Swiss-Prot record:
Belongs to the UPF0346 family. It comes from the Bacteria. HAMAP family: UPF0346 (MF_01538). This is UPF0346 protein llmg_2280. It comes from Lactococcus lactis subsp. cremoris (strain MG1363). Pfam families: YozE_SAM_like. SUPFAM superfamilies: YozE-like.
Length: 69
């Protein structure tokens, strides 16, 4: 499962946690690397190219949850 697929399982109209917030932001970003399973690629994208801001420390926590899923 890609990180994008993992995030899409957390989409919701009401943001209840960091994963939901990131999922909602990523869903609206057509350039997000949807096929990636690579931490560095996704982290770099969020840091340098994403059209939104998301705290990278929070991203790290969501990534750890992804790895445990």
């Amino acid at each position: 499962m890609t990180f994008y697929n993992y995030l899409m399982r957390h989409r919701a109209p009401v943001e209840k946690d960091d994963a939901t917030r990131l999922a909602n932001l990523v869903f609206q970003d057509p350039l997000f690397p949807k096929q990636s399973k690579d931490f560095d690629e996704i982290s770099t994208y969020l840091e340098t190219e994403a059209p939104f801001y998301f705290n990278l420390t929070l991203f790290d926590n969501v990534w750890l949850s992804y790895l445990e899923a």
